[in-house]
Amino acid sequence: MNFRNAHILTAMVTPFDDEGNYSSKRTKNLINYLLDNGTEGLLVSGTTGEAPTLSEDEKLQLIKDSVKFIDGRVPLMVGTGSNNTQQTIDYTNKVADIDGVDAALVVVPYYNKPNQKGMIAHFRKVADYSNLPIIIYNIPGRTGVTMEVDTIIELAQHDNIIGIKDCTGVENIAKIVENVPEDFLVYSGEDAEALSARVLGGQGIISVASHIYGDNMKTMYSSLESGDVSMAGKIMRDLIPKAEALFSYPSPSPVKAALNKIGYNVGGCRLPIVSLDKNEENELFKKLKI
C-alpha cells in the first residue's frame, strides 16, 4: 500500500504492560483506536515508539503485530535506521521480510556526525541494497547533524528514496517541495507545522498529537481541502499549545500519560525516559483539557 492518501501518520507509542513488557494486546487496542480516530497511516518503532530501548525481538514482534492489526486498512512505515550503514541495510531487509510493511524510515546517522558527502553515500547505499522504499528522517535536534536541503534534493532523485520526514522548519519544507519530484513524499515531523506543511504542498504530518487529536487534525485537513481556510486555521491555532504540551517533558512520557488518562492503557516509559509523576500529569492534563 502506498502513502498517497495518507496525510496524517501517527508516530505510534509502543504499549507496555504493567510490568514494562511489550504488550501485543494493548497494541491491538491502540491501533484500532487510532484508525478509528483520524490516523491514515502508522509509523512504528520510531522515536516516539522508544525504539532505542526495544530489543530486536520486541521490534520484530511489534511490526508483525502492527501488520496483523492494521489488516490492510492503512500503510505502515517502520523505523529501521541507525548510525551504522551496513547494520541499517541488514535490519531493513529483515523488516522487509515481514509482508505488509510499506516503507522504512531511516534517520540521518547520529553521533558519528557525517558531513553531507557522507550522508549522501550512506543513504544511496541503504537505498541501493534495501528491499523496502526508504524515507529519510531529518531531525537535527536528536542526531546532532542537519541534512541540507540541497542534499535532500539530490537524494530525492534516487528511485528507492520516496520521501522525507523533516523537522527543520517550514522554510526548508517549502524549498524541498519546490525542488523534488512530484511524487516525493514530504512530511513534517513537527505537529505545530501540520497545516503549514500541507498548504506548502507537502504530503502532511507524521504526528504525535494525533494520538489524542487525530479527528481534529483530519477535520483540519478536510476543511483546508474544501476551501474553509478559516476553520482549518482555527483548529491549528487550538492544536498548537496542546502539541507543545505533549513535548513539555521528554517524549513519549506526556503522550503515554495522556493515552492512559483517556482510557487507552499503554503503560509507562523505559529508562532513561521516566514516566510523569502525579503532579506532572495533572499539569499536563490541564493544558490538554482532558
Swiss-Prot record:
It is an enzyme of class 4 (lyase). CDD domains: DHDPS (cd00950). The keyword Cytoplasm applies. Coiled coil: none annotated. The keyword Membrane does not apply. It holds the Pfam family DHDPS. It catalyses: L-aspartate 4-semialdehyde + pyruvate = (2S,4S)-4-hydroxy-2,3,4,5-tetrahydrodipicolinate + H2O + H(+). The active site is at Y137, K165. GO terms for cellular component: cytosol. Its EC number is 4.3.3.7. SMART domains: DHDPS (SM01130). GO terms for biological process: diaminopimelate biosynthetic process; lysine biosynthetic process via diaminopimelate. Pyruvate binds at T48, I206. It is found in: Cytoplasm. Its main location: cytoplasm. The record marks T47, Y111 as: Part of a proton relay during catalysis. Pathway: Amino-acid biosynthesis; L-lysine biosynthesis via DAP pathway; (S)-tetrahydrodipicolinate from L-aspartate: step 3/4. GO terms for molecular function: 4-hydroxy-tetrahydrodipicolinate synthase activity. Keywords: Amino-acid biosynthesis, Cytoplasm, Diaminopimelate biosynthesis, Lyase, Lysine biosynthesis, Schiff base. Homotetramer; dimer of dimers. PANTHER family: 4-HYDROXY-2-OXOGLUTARATE ALDOLASE, MITOCHONDRIAL, DIHYDRODIPICOLINATE SYNTHASE. Catalyzes the condensation of (S)-aspartate-beta-semialdehyde [(S)-ASA] and pyruvate to 4-hydroxy-tetrahydrodipicolinate (HTPA). Belongs to the DapA family. This is 4-hydroxy-tetrahydrodipicolinate synthase. It comes from Ligilactobacillus salivarius (strain UCC118). The gene is dapA.
